[in-house]
Amino acid sequence: MASLTDLINLDLSDTTDKFIAEYIWIDAVGGLRSKARTLSGPVDDPTKLPKWNFDGSSTGQGPGDDSEVIIYPQAIFKDPFRRGNHILVMCDTYTPAGEPIPTNKRCNAAKIFSHPDVAAEVPWFGIEQEYTLLKKEVNCPIGCPTGGYPGPQGPYYCGIGADKAFGRDIVDAHYKACLYAGINISGINGEVMPGQWEFQVGPAVGISAGDELWVARYILERITEIAGVVVSLDPKPIPGDWNGAGAHTNYSTKSMRNEGGFEIIKKAIAKLETKHAQHIAAYGEGNERRLTGKHETASIHKFSWGVANRGASVRVGRDTEKEGKGYFEDRRPASNMEPYVVTSMIAETTIL
């Protein structure tokens, strides 16, 4: 008799040309939802996939008497769970009349990235997504002793060993699954707090940075579901003398990457300073608990920048200063930030 694992891993390619498409969307509180459908294929162009719908009253995105929300396929990735020709589909959300619903942040971001002035600058983003793995039964990072606290931070950052690195199997599974899916995941590392990790997505151009980060988050949620662990994107999951969790956003334009780009970078940083309050308001919930001026953060109340300064709002790398061109890092976004909002806002502020 076939086991459950055997059935889950069934290869359908020899018996049917049908494939499974997992449609993914963002709900009312910034969580991820998904459901699957059977299609004939294969398909590698999202415009050739059918639109679909879901019950918005069950996701906080529509009233019960008019609950249908339409999901538009926007980006396709290979499915690392079902494998074969099966796909993950990142979608955004609309009314039946074709208007983006309020929680659809991708639509406005796509408009900004399609602006001729923005498109001409070919904006690159690299996002450092920090997250914390928590025990399912209690709100405590994995690696915490039952009824107690781990030793102070210091040995956990890029640490190895059973007393320093907790959850590496999840991290490596996620790393490989993202590569399989076609996400440009560029690395992983253990972070400063026990049970805290980081993966990096990018460089990615324009709207694709948001698509790739959201699907990477989805894959992480699915893997932790299998492992029986909870993934938290809270910017300060554990109060006290512990680092928070951010989503540092590295950014460059064509002009910044060319000769003389450092001067363009400094002008862009000056523009960010003039809109510090607006950016902070859009950079994630609970960020005031993280941006305290301690634990490698700048104060939420004051904009600052510097070369190699991880206590600044914006950091410029030594290599960029030395070469006179390159990129900068906006260190303000929280781990739970909306990547469509953050990336498009940075581009809009610095280019338009």
Swiss-Prot record:
InterPro entries: Gln_synt_N (IPR008147), Gln_synt_N_sf (IPR036651), Gln_synth/guanido_kin_cat_dom (IPR014746), Gln_synth_cat_dom (IPR008146), Gln_synth_gly_rich_site (IPR027303), Gln_synth_N_conserv_site (IPR027302), Glutamine_Synthetase (IPR050292). Keywords: ATP-binding, Cytoplasm, Ligase, Nucleotide-binding. One of its GO terms (molecular function) is glutamine synthetase activity. GO terms for biological process: glutamine biosynthetic process. The keyword Nucleus does not apply. GO terms for cellular component: cytoplasm. Residues 19-98 form the GS beta-grasp domain. It is found in: Cytoplasm. It holds the Pfam family Gln-synt_C. It catalyses: L-glutamate + NH4(+) + ATP = L-glutamine + ADP + phosphate + H(+). Residues 105-352 form the GS catalytic domain. Its EC number is 6.3.1.2. Homooctamer. Belongs to the glutamine synthetase family. This is Glutamine synthetase cytosolic isozyme. It comes from Daucus carota. The lineage of its organism: Eukaryota, Viridiplantae, Streptophyta, Embryophyta, Tracheophyta.
